[in-house]
Amino acid sequence: MSKSLIVALDFPGKKEVEQFLQHFEGEELFVKVGMELFYKEGPAIITYLKEKGHKIFLDLKLHDIPNTVKSAMRSLASLDVDMVNVHAAGGSSMMKAALEGLEEGKQEGKERPICIAVTQLTSTSEVMMKKEIGIEKTLEEAVAHYAKLTKESGLDGVVCSTLEVPKLREVCGDEFVTVTPGIRLASDDVNDQVRVATPKRARELGSSYIVVGRSITKAENPLEAYQTVKQQWEGVTV
């Protein structure tokens, strides 16, 4: 199965995760563990998923003073997760501190986790950004600014909308990692996300990784839905 397709385990606890993963016995997935699940189950959920052979994107979006983020990342790296993130709005010093913590905390003989930054949440519209957050740039300009700052700080890439990927390729180059949530099958509701795209569109726009949640986790047949997303993402004709 594709390692560039990340399945969001947006469940309230381990019981629901176990029920979901029964559909994928023997398969190694790349999964995302977010705040809800991690805060409920703690590091034990990471250990459980690793024992099952899955890769893990631990999506906690750290945003604090540099020393606190450094210490937190040192702890997270010791869990042997594969990807972590911070908010780019925390600034360059904070992002550099995150990398230092990951290097110090990584397990012996292992590479440090991929570290990416959130530019703007996919629930953020330009009106919201200007009116409520107080950023006067256009949404595209703000995302590009944060992405450039992220690259200059030494991080591997950003979380962004698929619609922003082409511009970020221009600004940050082809090797810069773009992780894009807000992915839905064409038949699904968009729910609370504003900037969404299909797996096919994400591929066409050049995303490095896509994160898919409800289209798979809420499907009547999760494995079948996963395969459909995977085929669209990889451009496989069936």
From Swiss-Prot:
> What GO biological process term is on the record, naming one?
'de novo' pyrimidine nucleobase biosynthetic process
Q: Where is the active site?
A: K61
Its UniProt pathway annotation is: Pyrimidine metabolism; UMP biosynthesis via de novo pathway; UMP from orotate: step 2/2
Q: Name one GO cellular component term.
A: cytosol
> Which residues are in coiled coils?
none
Q: Which UniProt keywords apply?
A: Decarboxylase, Lyase, Pyrimidine biosynthesis
Query: Which reactions does this protein catalyse?
Result: orotidine 5'-phosphate + H(+) = UMP + CO2
What are the binding positions for substrate in this chain?
A: 10, 32, 59-68, 122, 184, 193, 213-214
Q: What is its EC number?
A: 4.1.1.23
Its function, per the record, reads: Catalyzes the decarboxylation of orotidine 5'-monophosphate (OMP) to uridine 5'-monophosphate (UMP).
Q: Which family does it belong to?
A: Belongs to the OMP decarboxylase family. Type 1 subfamily.
Q: What is this protein called?
A: Orotidine 5'-phosphate decarboxylase
Species, as recorded:
Bacillus cytotoxicus (strain DSM 22905 / CIP 110041 / 391-98 / NVH 391-98)
